[in-house]
């Protein structure tokens, strides 16, 4: 870390390489300690139509899970939901599911909801969400197949990697790129300063 920033101990409770890169872009020193919580079980138990509430709940559970093992650290956790017509599109994990997701999203508007929280000593200090709205071009079967073979975005909600070739799939985007990638940076920076986790 440069002498420009003074900071307290921070942990990113995420295994996402994109979130790791975004955090690194801020010049922070931090540990990466992914949570062991069962996200699918939490999603199954969630019986509300409030999808933002689900995303915030997942972020909080991840942060609290890690915080109990690292009470001296400020824990940053996040969750990302890809939503269209009140349906959540989880990570496809395989080629055929990715094809199905892109077929369903083709030509339509959907949202990427990024949810964040900061926890210290098992206390929730800050929570936040931000939504980006994206519209895909009408995608041919040939385009879907060629894109998936090129990028294999099977670990990405929505079956695309917006940080890479995925940008070519869209005709309209409203919202910041870091929100689409799952870690809205300016709100996080302001929260870290306001909580005196980081000083300049």
From Swiss-Prot:
CDD domains: Maf
Pfam families membership: Maf (PF02545)
Organism: Legionella pneumophila (strain Paris)
MF term (GO), any: nucleoside triphosphate diphosphatase activity
Family: Belongs to the Maf family.
The protein's role, per its UniProt record: Nucleoside triphosphate pyrophosphatase. May have a dual role in cell division arrest and in preventing the incorporation of modified nucleotides into cellular nucleic acids.
Catalytic reactions on record: a ribonucleoside 5'-triphosphate + H2O = a ribonucleoside 5'-phosphate + diphosphate + H(+); a 2'-deoxyribonucleoside 5'-triphosphate + H2O = a 2'-deoxyribonucleoside 5'-phosphate + diphosphate + H(+)
Main subcellular location: cytoplasm
This enzyme's EC code(s): 3.6.1.9
Keyword Glycoprotein: no
Protein name per its UniProtKB record: Nucleoside triphosphate pyrophosphatase
Disulfide links within the chain: none
Cross-referenced HAMAP family: Maf
GO BP terms in the entry: nucleotide metabolic process
Key words, A-Z: Cytoplasm, Hydrolase, Nucleotide metabolism
Source species taxonomy: Bacteria, Pseudomonadati, Pseudomonadota, Gammaproteobacteria, Legionellales
């Amino acid at each position: 870390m440069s002498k420009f920033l003074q900071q307290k101990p921070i942990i990113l409770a995420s295994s996402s390489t994109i979130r790791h890169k975004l955090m690194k872009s801020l010049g922070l020193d931090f540990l990466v300690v992914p949570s062991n919580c069962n996200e699918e079980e939490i999603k199954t138990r969630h019986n509300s139509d409030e999808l933002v509430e689900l995303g915030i709940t997942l972020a909080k559970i991840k942060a609290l899970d890690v915080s109990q093992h690292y009470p001296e650290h400020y824990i940053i956790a996040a969750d990302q939901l890809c939503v269209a017509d009140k349906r959540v599109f989880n990570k496809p994990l395989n080629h055929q599911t990715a094809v199905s997701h892109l077929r369903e999203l083709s030509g339509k508007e959907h949202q990427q909801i990024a949810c964040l929280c900061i926890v210290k000593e098992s206390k929730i200090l800050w929570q936040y969400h931000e939504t980006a709205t994206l519209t895909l071009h009408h995608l041919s079967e040939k385009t879907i197949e060629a894109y998936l073979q090129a990028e294999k975005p099977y670990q990405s909600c929505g079956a695309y990697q917006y940080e890479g070739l995925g940008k070519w799939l869209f005709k309209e985007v409203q919202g910041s790129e870091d929100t689409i990638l799952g870690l809205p940076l300016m709100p996080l920076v302001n929260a870290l300063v306001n909580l005196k986790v980081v000083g300049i």
